């Protein structure tokens, strides 16, 4: 079964938890609402892109997306059609790669990314069942659907250039089966030379659900 992320926050984000935590500590940022901060402070956001702190895929529809990483997952097969192909986003990994719903930065709960064991728990007011482990987080809706909010891949520490391909299923299936997905690949580099900004709407469009 494909790994997946539900983009309830209308975006997906890729980062290494320790890279982000060390950046926040160095910049003396104590606010947990990292997403709001980066939306308001453009110079700080651009610094995250220059240093490879995180890569957001903004302004995408609230959908369930299949997630694949080159070298660890099988590529999308001929039942899918590629819609986008972007390359060259800086990303520094120190303790594995997290791929999350972008709302997981609002707030960014650092301890959630260092769980040592699997754990089920519930949250008020509806008593929704949640699950967290060293490799993934999800919760169950009132309709018993599982919504994945964060998944982790074990990736060696280092600096990488991230490539992003977006795919759409040629023949749609019923929800919650994903009909769109992203295939990510990482190319190791010694240093970052310049950077690309995925929030530049004129250059990048990640909303593959509109390309069916």
Question: What residues fall within each predicted segment?
Answer:
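Intrinsically disordered, low-complexity segments enriched in polar/charged residues with Gly/Pro
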Residues: 77, 138-141
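Arginine-glycine-biased low-complexity disordered regions
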Residues: 134-136
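Beta-sandwich interaction modules
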Residues: 140-154
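Extracellular structured ligand-interaction cores
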Residues: 150, 159-161, 181
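A glycine-anchored, Pro-Gly-centered beta-turn/N-cap motif
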Residues: 155-168
